[in-house]
Amino acid sequence: MDPAWVGDTVYFISDRDGVANVWSYDTKAKKLAQVTRFTDFDVKTVDSGAGAVVFEQAGYVHELDPKSGREHVVTITAAGDFPWMMARWEDVTSRMTNISLSPTGKRVVVESRGEIFTIPAEKGDVRNLTNSAASAERDPAWSPDGKFISYFSDKSGEYKLVIEEQDGLKPPREIALANPTHYYTPAWSPDSKKILFTDTGLHLWVLDVATGQARTVGRDPWMVPRRTMNPVWSPDSKWIAYSSHLDSLYHAIFVVNAETGENKQVTDGLSDAMWQAWDAGGKYLWFLASTDFGLGSQWLYMTSYDHTQTFGLYCAVLKKGEPSPLLPESDEDQGVGSAPSGGSGGRGGRGGAPAGEGAAAEAGGAQADQPAPTPRGPRTPVTVTIDFAGLPQRIISIPGVANRQYSALEAGVAGTVYYLEAGGGGGGRGGAGGGSVLWRYRLSDRREAQFVTGVAEYALSADGHKLLYRGTGGGGGAGGGGGRGGAAIGPALFLVDADRNPPQAGQGRLTATLRMYLDPKEEFKQIFDEGWRNQRDYLYVPNMHGTDWVKDKQMYAQLLPSVMHRADLNYLIDMMGSEISIGHSYVRGGDMPEVPTSPGGGLLGADFAIDAGRYKIARIYDTESWNPDLRAPLAAPGVDVAVGDYILQIGGIDLKAPDNIYRLLDGTANRQTVLTVNSKPVVEGARQVTVVPVASEQALRTRAWVESNRRQVEKLSNGQLAYVYIPNTSQPGYQSFNRYYFAQQDKKGAVVDERYNGGGSAADYIVDVLQRDFDGYFNNVAGDRVPFTSPAAGIWGPKVMIINEMAGSGGDLMPYMFKFRKIGTLVGKRTWGGLVHTADTPTFVDGGSMIAPRGGFFSKDGRWAVENEGVAPDIDVENTPKEVIAGHDPQLERAVEEGMRLLKAKPANLMTKEPASPTWGKRGVPAKPTAPSAPSAPPRKPGDPR
């Protein structure tokens, strides 16, 4: 790679000896030689000039003398101020996440850029409990007794559990955890004596606060992209409910005894049950369940597309003999002075909210604020009794709650639950500009009500009376005109009464500003260490592909003091990750220094040639057919511009070669721009046209390439082969396949082009359709009575797939499946070779990330496959620059040739006529007997049962 000429010799980088070094090839002597022999850091780039070769290695620039073969490090002195590397006070308010509340909602605790802050509801100051850019503190949780805040901290180099007094005035207590890794979902028991949490390996832990000892009490045996255990404590601190995958990949609800560790499965696995929550009254276990989960269980696969899974609200009655909370109700007049009846039909008997705990009516949604409720005391202690025998038969579906895309179920005061519905702006039940809808359901009135929109996450106080939510910036309160399209609320925190009427739009907004003292050098080291740990803890195999990962860290850490820009930190972490030799180990993002940006360069959707010192239009790209999302500036109706015209001025400024046309188009994207054009390269007689340049031509040029290929296949095959392009294995690829494949099912075969496929999901749906055969016919009573195939949708002749080295991930797996199932012929070049999937690697404190692949592919014979290997074609064809420049596509042309050969060898041979009409209604004529026979039965009379 990276070739550079010096005379007749080409210098380039090759890792054929295991480390990327400089090699050379003498084109006259036809001699190959290794030039450098580094054994630690790879050579990264090579260039040449003035008879010398320069290259980068280990962060230094080296100069190589081709004659002597000697190289030396070039001394470069470049002084810079690097203002972005100065320690400073940083506003991190916009980075709040993992929000939580004090027991009664007097203060809020959040994580923001690796710091733990508490925020007053009304009075007081913001407190930063951690104050260290050199470490990451995550996932705060407030103890129900109000005394402590716990969080995880990597200050020691590994994550530990930290317990700190809520005012932050005393040194915190650090608790080392076995097999240190990344931790999730911390939750204090209601009695503040234990803390539960989960880890990278999907184990459920319970830690005794007094002793600091932790033990596992449950696990999820299947790793899928979302972490869905979501463990929760029972009100009496005796039980933990969590969800775990069964071998069917459906979730079931489990309950574990926190003392004994005994696990019991609550749901039977015939629904996908998760997001469990204990009712505060101790009588019920709420959860969400889906009976249409089905294809959603195969989360990686395209077959699950267009199959939306919805969830309903359910409630399990824990104790045998406890009445259903939904028994029929009837208003009965007891006479003046009579006390209200209780029993199973009243609120008391159903575990409903007592006075002052959510009994307020919600008719019509938004109402004026009610008077302040009576001050509340602590919850009455409850004892949770669970009769596991017969428990599945005591599960109740909650009526009046339509099945939707629910998640994040939480329990408030007794008889009240909250849950999010996925929404995405633009009407419906989603917020006006994104985020989810928060719903509340109360047994007291047996109905759900929309509580607030535009929610990113929410939390309830331990007493259930306060609700904190983080907005997305596009929703609003359910009251005061918020509704389903409420006023914008901004990405901020809102603290509202949980058991009162839905809040007005913007009500309860917390205006605190979170600031931390940020030393970028310290934060860079923490991010570097975290990237290393992420690979150690999340990589799909434990052996790090055989590399010495500890040694790798030590080697690359030497360069860390020289890193003076966030992009350079990404580069360093990426180089370290390359030692594992794995695809999808992407390093990206982070808090980059702000730089001035252009308002957007404009593009005209055209190719140009220089003629007579002017820019001449050589080609105009249009939107082709049926592409409403495309806009072609020069092909719009009414724009009087044609191929061969000259663009003489842009915005009144003269345009002549060698001036760059794009200089005059800078800042014109999506803005009206006046062009002066003429059929001749002179201003005299020119005309002015107003166009609106686009910001990108990629979609226009891609569509033109696709349609050109389709027409070429149509021409070369005499209309017998379809052409289908699949850009990726995500939604765009799914849509492109469905659009082009079925629209051409009148063809006899197909050329499927997946070159440059960007991957996404596993394209089982596409491969299944390509493999599909038909089983017979149904006749057609119209036209020439050409019959329908059964199934009707498909192309039944040969298929050829074109692949190249720029197709990877899902673009690797699709041709692998195509080849493995012997559907057809692969033509082109070996694919990229990156077949692992990614999932849940945590982000860095500044929003960047380093992905650790979470799953690798191996074949049915037990061999790791495709990763670092790719899928080889059956017919190897290179698209050489010479042939492409000449207007040819050798891979496409060879694919058509192969398709036509297969079509001749194995034609589909579809029937074009139906058989002779059947005569099933014709009465048969009995044959004349040739020998005496028994007397025949008398004719059957009407009504005779024989």
Feature roles, as predicted:
Residues 1-6, 15-17, 24-44, 66-94, ...:
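Multi-bladed beta-propeller domains
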Residues 5-7, 48-50, 103-104, 144-145, ...:
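Residue-level detector of Asp-centered blade-edge/turn motifs that repeat once per structural unit
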Residues 10, 53, 108, 149, ...:
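Hydrophobic beta-strand positions that form the internal "hydrophobic ladder"
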Residues 18-23, 62-64, 117, 158-162, ...:
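Structural motif
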Residues 245, 289-308, 321-346, 354, ...:
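Short, conserved, GDST-rich strand-edge loop motifs in beta-rich repeat architectures
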Residues 561-616, 683-691, 696-709, 896-932:
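Extended, small/polar residue-biased N-terminal targeting/export presequences
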Residues 599-657, 730-731, 855-856:
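PDZ/PDZ-like domain segments forming the peptide/carboxylate-binding groove
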Residues 624-634, 648, 653-845, 883-890, ...:
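Cleft-lining beta-strand/loop regions that shape enzyme active-site pockets
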